[in-house]
A protein has these predicted regions:
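Conserved short histidine dyad/triad with adjacent acidic residue
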Residues: 24-27, 38-55
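A short beta-strand-loop-beta hairpin characteristic of the jelly-roll/cupin
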Residues: 49, 54-82, 89-92
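Short, charged/polar surface micro-motifs in flexible loops or helix N-caps
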Residues: 33-35, 44-47, 67-69
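Generic structural detector for well-ordered beta-strands
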Residues: 27-29, 43, 71, 79
């Protein structure tokens, strides 16, 4: 068993090649073999957004506070709110 205590890992600013605006990334856990899952709490200041990108194994977003928008490239912009879970399949922008 491995317990990661809140605040035990350093926060970082989201890199400008990944994000527009001010974004804070708080790592929660990294994948330990044989697992492939990692998690982070990502906080977006108003107006901040993610650059178009893909994840080879897909990505799950869990909205914990605030509201925002999610969109697949070329798709409809969807409003997301606390409690919503968004799944992006592998390779989808």
């Amino acid at each position: 068993m491995d317990i990661k205590r809140i605040g035990s890992q350093p926060s970082g600013r989201g890199p400008p090649d990944w994000f527009t605006g001010t974004v804070r990334i708080d790592p929660l856990f990294k994948a330990s073999d044989p697992a492939r899952v990692a998690g982070a709490s990502v906080t977006f200041e108003p107006g901040a957004r993610t650059a178009w990108h893909t994840h080879p194994l897909g990505q799950t977003l869990i909205v914990t506070a605030g509201c925002g928008w999610a969109q697949r490239q070329g798709g409809t912009i969807e409003e997301i709110k606390p409690g919503d879970v968004v799944w992006f399949p592998p390779g989808e922008k």
